[in-house]
Amino acid sequence: MSTVYINIFLAFTMSLMGLLMYRSHLMSSLLCLEGMMLSLFIMMTVAILNNHFTLASMTPIILLVFAACEAALGLSLLVMVSNTYGTDYVQNLNLLQC
């Protein structure tokens, strides 16, 4: 396994650990999700270029489209939550609270 793959895998793992550890704020969760998507995009692109998969060359672009849609929805959710509750705590989003 080359150093590039190890670094990209470590970036994905660090983003996943950040998502698990700093999940109290919605903004930090969204940033960790974006880091995961970016490292996944780079990993897929490097793997496709190294293995010369010509048929799968469109897959990273599709992943970027889904990442952009996820970022737009996350940003709109963040604006809605911060306007409604005044903060971006994920604990305020509990539907079972009375």
From Swiss-Prot:
<keyword id="KW-1278">Translocase</keyword>
<keyword id="KW-0472">Membrane</keyword>
<keyword id="KW-0679">Respiratory chain</keyword>
<keyword id="KW-1133">Transmembrane helix</keyword>
<feature type="transmembrane region" description="Helical">
    <location>
        <begin position="61"/>
        <end position="81"/>
    </location>
</feature>
<dbReference type="InterPro" id="IPR001133">
    <property type="entry name" value="NADH_UbQ_OxRdtase_chain4L/K"/>
</dbReference>
<keyword id="KW-0812">Transmembrane</keyword>
<keyword id="KW-0813">Transport</keyword>
<keyword id="KW-0999">Mitochondrion inner membrane</keyword>
<dbReference type="GO" id="GO:0008137">
    <property type="term" value="F:NADH dehydrogenase (ubiquinone) activity"/>
</dbReference>
<keyword id="KW-0830">Ubiquinone</keyword>
<dbReference type="Pfam" id="PF00420">
    <property type="entry name" value="Oxidored_q2"/>
</dbReference>
<dbReference type="InterPro" id="IPR039428">
    <property type="entry name" value="NUOK/Mnh_C1-like"/>
</dbReference>
<feature type="transmembrane region" description="Helical">
    <location>
        <begin position="29"/>
        <end position="49"/>
    </location>
</feature>
<comment type="subunit">
    <text>Core subunit of respiratory chain NADH dehydrogenase (Complex I) which is composed of 45 different subunits.</text>
</comment>
<protein>
    <recommendedName>
        <fullName>NADH-ubiquinone oxidoreductase chain 4L</fullName>
        <ecNumber>7.1.1.2</ecNumber>
    </recommendedName>
</protein>
<comment type="function">
    <text>Core subunit of the mitochondrial membrane respiratory chain NADH dehydrogenase (Complex I) which catalyzes electron transfer from NADH through the respiratory chain, using ubiquinone as an electron acceptor. Part of the enzyme membrane arm which is embedded in the lipid bilayer and involved in proton translocation.</text>
</comment>
<dbReference type="GO" id="GO:0042773">
    <property type="term" value="P:ATP synthesis coupled electron transport"/>
</dbReference>
<dbReference type="GO" id="GO:0045271">
    <property type="term" value="C:respiratory chain complex I"/>
</dbReference>
<feature type="transmembrane region" description="Helical">
    <location>
        <begin position="1"/>
        <end position="21"/>
    </location>
</feature>
<keyword id="KW-0249">Electron transport</keyword>
<dbReference type="GO" id="GO:0005743">
    <property type="term" value="C:mitochondrial inner membrane"/>
</dbReference>
<keyword id="KW-0520">NAD</keyword>
<keyword id="KW-0496">Mitochondrion</keyword>
<comment type="similarity">
    <text>Belongs to the complex I subunit 4L family.</text>
</comment>
